[in-house]
Amino acid sequence: MNIIQLTPQLLLESKPNAEAYLNELIDSTITSTSWMTNWQDVASRFQLFKFLDLSAEEMLSHSWNEEMIAQVVSETIKTVEKHIELNQDLLITLVPALPFPWFSNIEQSILTNVFTNISQSIWIAIPPNPDISFLRYLLAHELHHSAPNNPIYELTLDNFPLNNWYKMEGTAEYFSLQLFDDKRWWK
């Protein structure tokens, strides 16, 4: 398992060649069975193009404690692995979080842009000072989605009815809430 921290500093350094840099990084995480198969869609989902439009000072203000976050992610993975099998090739990519305009009045909402694109790839938008308990819960939820034996990988866009989506989300919620504190802001 690997963790990539696509930090504000890295994005700032890659700014002159950002499109090529993001294309290479994101495209390497996409396969023919990914939910999102276009690197620009992933970059847009995580507002990376918008982030690149910020000034250097604004970009760096979104920095987080990389060592602490790596430790939290590693510990969370170990906890989850006691209960479910995870893909050994799993790649967790952390990117800077920008607020969504429709939840701008809820501080915690900035940490809810998370996506499992395939059993080998989880993306998390992370704010500078995340609530660690909430981050653990959120990551456990996504790790549940990423488990290679999860029936989600039998679903396609053609056979993914709403009731299956509710089951998928509900089981991931139940699983993560059994392991970590309930810090959900939407409950």
Language-model regions, residue ranges each:
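Auxiliary, metal-adjacent structural segments of Zn-dependent hydrolase domains
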Residues: D53-I118, I132
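Active-site recognition of the HExxH zinc-binding catalytic motif
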Residues: Y137-P151, E173
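Short pre-active-site segment immediately N-terminal to the catalytic Zn-binding motif
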Residues: W123-L139
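Cysteine-nucleophile amide-bond enzymes
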Residues: E19-N23, T29, V73-S74, K78-K82, ...
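Post-HExxH zinc-binding segment in Zn-dependent metallohydrolases
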Residues: N159-K187
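N-terminal low-structure segments adjacent to metalloprotease catalytic domains
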Residues: M1-W64
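Conserved binding/catalytic microenvironments
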Residues: S119, I126-P127, L143, P151, ...
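Hydrophobic, aromatic-lined core segments that form the binding pocket/scaffold
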Residues: T116-I118, A147, T171
